[in-house]
Amino acid sequence: SVNVSVQVGGGIRDLYSVRRLLDLGVTRAMLGTVAVQDPELVSRVCIEFGSDAVMVSVDARDGFVSVSGWTSNSKLPASQLVETMREAGVQTFQYTDISRDGTLTEPNYSAIIEMVAQTDGHLIAAGGISELGQLLRLAELGASGAVVGTAIYTGDIDLAEAVDALSQVGG
């Protein structure tokens, strides 16, 4: 038995789905497109299950939110979505610069700095992470976490080394 928190996102569009996930033991439901299309639902989720049970995924290209699996770009600034969701009761956010996701370039530090400030540090950063030094910089900037996929898959980041290094800096 492993004690691990599980966060699930993708296709969650109603209160029933959130309830079902939480009943199964999921720690947090990650809401994306629905946060743009039905902000009232996000507010209801926060009221019914508490703000710890939800995270909003802010997927952005050039500072504007993308929805529907990144297939549709909106005219909604990412910062405005965060503001609206904070008013709805959301505390934790994931920010992905989708133009960098999977590219092994580097994170969009300027956007992440803004998002960290706007979320009081309750931000998980994603997109473009390619090396351990970038994870350490994200921790220094105040991000509470990071999503690393491609860099672990390619071997550019050793997971055990990253966990050890980040634990030493409190990240």
Locations of regions flagged by a protein language model:
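Alpha-helix-loop-beta-strand connector modules within alpha/beta enzyme cores
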Residues: 1-7, 39-59, 104-131, 170-171
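Catalytic cores of alpha/beta
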Residues: 2, 6-7, 12-28, 110-148
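Structural motif corresponding to alpha-helix initiation and N-cap regions
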Residues: 15, 36-39, 75-79, 109, ...
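Conserved anion-binding
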Residues: 19-22, 26-101
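Active-site phosphate/pyrophosphate- and oxyanion-stabilizing loops and adjacent acidic/basic residues
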Residues: 43, 83, 113, 136, ...
